[in-house]
A protein has these predicted regions:
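Extended acidic low-complexity intrinsically disordered regions
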Residues: 1-11
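Short, surface-exposed, charged amphipathic helix/loop patches that serve as local interaction elements
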Residues: 8-10, 17-94
Length: 94
């Protein structure tokens, strides 16, 4: 069961891919609104937007400069991380 304090304080989630550590930021209400907008206007960019918006290095700096940069991320990275990000949008609803 997720820690409700971590959810409400938007503490990032520690993550790792191919030995590289990074963080996944929890979504805010503004992120939810923007995610709906992105999915409505350009669904082909939705996965890249998720990576761009939520992936950060261990110092909290974005891993990707923009959505176009995130679109160039390795497919294996996106396949692992995007479902983790999507799950955060439903975190705590139970």
């Amino acid at each position: 069961m997720p820690d409700i304090r971590a959810i409400l304080s938007l503490q990032p989630i520690a993550a790792e891919w191919n030995g590289c550590r990074f963080q996944i930021s929890r979504p805010t209400l503004a992120d939810l609104v923007e995610a709906v907008d992105v999915n409505t206007k350009s669904p082909e960019n939705a996965r890249a937007w998720c990576l761009y918006r939520h992936c950060q290095d261990t110092d909290g700096k974005p891993l990707f400069a923009d959505v176009a940069d995130a679109m160039a991320a390795p497919a294996g990275f996106a396949a692992k991380v995007v479902p983790q990000i999507e799950a955060l949008y439903n975190e705590g609803v139970d």
